[in-house]
Amino acid sequence: MFFSRRLGAAAIRRAGRASLRSYDVVIVGAGVAGLSCARTLQAAGLDLLVIDAADGVGGRVRTDVCDGFLLDRGFQVLLTAYPEARRMLDYDRLRLRRFYPGALVRYSGKWRRVADPMRRPFAGALSVFNPIGSLADKLRVGRLRFSGGRRHATGPEKDTLRALREEGFSDAMIERFLRPFLGGVFLETELRTTARKFASVWRRFAAGDIAVPAEGMGRIPEQLAAELPEGALCLGSRVEALGPGGVRLSDGESIAAANVVIATEAGEAARLLDGRLDPPEFNGVSCLYFEAPTPPLREPILALNGDGTGPINNLTVMSEVSACYAPEGKALVSATVLKAWASETPVLERAVRAQFRDWFGEQANAWKLLRHYRIKHAVPFQTSSPLVAPRVRKGVYVCGDHCDVASLDSAMASGRAAAACLLEERAARA
């Protein structure tokens, strides 16, 4: 059985009822940007309504349930050092489950461990002798860990690959570890993403843990939404256009509001704003989830393709990260595909299974495909740093991960920035 996890009905207001009143603010989009904006405006005492065409909150950050397994819509993680996430979220209530600080790299027929020497000193010392880069490369990683790549965060724009070469990394280190690792973050393996995004996420990797909520990434937007007052969400309703003094829904209903915040994905935001926003290109991804009788890796660790052959870029046994992701006695394997992400399911499944057999042997024949998520607009492809101001015009604002170097954290920060801009202008008008 497959179903989307949703909030309780008490949180949701029907569009017809919403149209009977006027709001201080209507927020279009119930992703993490829109919900963060709503939280900030609610704390300031504004009467608001969040509208989304989907049947649940979260946008791209959602978790489905399939035969007792929790399936995030694409492999996603939370970096615990994200400053905005620390501000907005209650980590204890999320019951975060942390990944091993390092990775397993599949290279030349074997799994090679790369460990953070600051958190796993013994394993880090042993990894010095594996063929995933030279000793000098490992020392450069340590240096970059302490510097956080700050010198790449300012100055002329350059791509991540150039930044790595400026750091002195060898081709072996880049191809066997950094390309698949950062490729899994950016969802592109050419590493053309701006080095400013690289510097931003590298600092967070160095300063904290990689984690997921025990019950799936969807718990993050669900926690944000749970803080809103009853009836502040209008789900299953699509905003067709902005109108004078509010928004018009696709069913013809109009909802009056003094202010409107567009918190949708970039393409939809551009449509609603009549070309006032230039939407970025996006990187796509496929994520395939498999049910396995036993876990092929018995630890909460990220596995990387260091050979560069086959469709899989990275793999994780999610049930080893959090037992909640799979029913008792079963394992959940997540495989991320970048280069061939758009392939049809039967074609991609055959190629992925062939790689499974190469990595894990005949046990992979017994694995059952649960679901294939093909996500066309997964992450904005940013070769330069976008700087989208939250104010579009009087009473209209925009937020989302496309407004800054894209991440879960920047989406939250963008939502709060839009709320702050709105409140400042509202105070000035008063």
What annotation goes with each model-predicted range?
Residues 82-86, 90, 94-191, 205-207:
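Mobile amphipathic helical/loop "lid" adjacent to a hydrophobic cofactor/ligand pocket
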Residues 2-18, 318, 323-430:
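Conserved flavin/dinucleotide-binding core of flavoenzymes
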Residues 62-80, 141-151:
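Glycine-rich active-site loop/strand segments that organize a redox cofactor
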Residues 42-66:
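Glycine-rich FAD pyrophosphate-binding loop
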Residues 76-83, 153-158, 167, 203-225, ...:
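Short beta-strand to alpha-helix junction loop
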Residues 198-249, 255, 259:
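Helical element adjacent to the flavin cofactor pocket in flavoenzyme catalytic cores
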Residues 23-50, 423:
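N-terminal Rossmann-like FAD-binding beta1-loop-alpha1 element of flavoenzymes
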Residues 2-8, 19-21, 240-350, 355-359:
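Mid-domain catalytic core of redox enzymes
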